[in-house]
Amino acid sequence: MSIDLTNGPVTKKMMLFSLPLIAGNLLQQTYNIADTVIVGRFLGADALAAVGSSYALMTFLTSILLGLCMGSGALFSIRYGEKNEEKLKESIGASFLMIAAVAILLNGLVCRNTGWILEFLQVPQQVYDGMRTYLEVVFTGILATFLYNYFASLLRAAGESLIPLIFLAVCAVLNIVLDLWFVIGLDAGIAGAAVATVLSQWISGIGIAVYTWGRCPQFRLRRRDFRITKDTFGEIFQFSFLTCVQQSVMNLGILMVQGLVNSFGPIVMAAFAAAVKIDSFAYMPVQDFGNAFSTFVAQNYGAGKQERIREGARKSVLLVLGFCLVISASVFVFAKQLLLIFVQPYETEILAVGIQYLRIEGVFYFGIGFLFLFYGYYRAVRKPGMSVVLTVISLGTRVVLAYVLSAVPQIGVSGIWSAVPIGWILADIAGWIYYKKLQQR
């Protein structure tokens, strides 16, 4: 059922829309984590390091497509708020052609350059073969990732967040079952875990595409809608390209940090791989709430309801702050227990590094929570360039400080972890200053 975010109680409408979004991405994290848990438990620390380190690279690559889909989704939401069906269909057809072309190009580039990419990331020899095997299989699912994210963005733009959740739930359950079958039942190793992920992605991507075209007449396009005019290209470029840049810069920074982590060896790599999974799972709800907030703002921006946007912003800040305080306390207290999901109790060195990471970064989840709200807001009010600026501040600070601090012998690897919240908070300050300037105009 689609939710009209331009009318009715603000908090209730945002929560009804965001909860399936949050549940969906928690499921997505669950099936991402499934690879890591099963590989770490049954194939050992080197395999865990290989699969966990692959996650940073895959996140960077898929962030390009995700950014394009998110940017298009903001435009779809504005068109939906304007009740302009003709313009909406033009935007859908043109953006599909543009993003599909990028997905095909990206798939070809990464498949041909896997070896060079691993060398750039300074992957240790003992995990090189496993990481290459995993990536070569997982890369075949890039087009499936495009299909799911594109049609999920389209449905969410119309206030429909439950259907994407259903397809993601099927994908998550299937991935876990196939992981167990390939890795344990068939003894297929790292390649088996990758095949399980790819099969699940294709089923989810094709399924949601068929549903959207078949069951949503407002999105059923005519042949003439599949064309790219100068005006349509300009609008999609404005939203999608800058959102893509923002997502790519964010994940490129993470990828550069991954390269630095790799230089500390397999123990730190394995700890980082496990801790990042926990980290992502912990703040995923506020990331999804930020996306829901973006849809809320975009629909009301299209409808010209500025006061409703301000009310939604105030209430969203309080909701995010409350959630982050609870999650930060939980991660700090239960850091060891959470890491034991991924590693064995006797792997004490990995546990020590992972606990250090979670307790330094986890205290500051409110920083990333507010940042996701700023990202969503600026994307929705046609200021996606500001999201890029905030990302550059956050990730630039993180990367520079990570390299500088970790080079100090007395600080070492903990400097990489400390750089993260500093970047978040500096970006939040910049986002708030610009928000106040916009309100004064």
Predicted segment positions?
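Short runs within selected transmembrane alpha-helices of multi-pass transporters and secretion channels
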Residues: 69, 137-156, 164-172, 193-208, ...
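N-terminal transmembrane alpha-helices
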Residues: 5-42, 56-71, 75, 100-107, ...
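Transmembrane helical elements of multi-pass membrane transporters/channels
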Residues: 16-35, 137, 171, 200-204, ...
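Small-residue-rich hydrophobic transmembrane alpha-helices
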Residues: 48-108, 145-164, 271-335, 368-390
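Helix-terminus/linker motif at the lipid-water interface of multi-pass membrane proteins
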Residues: 26, 30-49, 118-125, 181-188, ...
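Small-residue hotspots at the loop-to-helix junctions and early N-terminal turns
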Residues: 45-56, 135, 194, 266-281, ...
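Hydrophobic transmembrane alpha-helices of multi-pass small-molecule transporters
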Residues: 60-63, 175-179, 205-209, 281-284, ...
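Short alpha-helical transmembrane segments in multi-pass integral membrane proteins
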Residues: 1-18, 76-141, 185-241, 297-364, ...
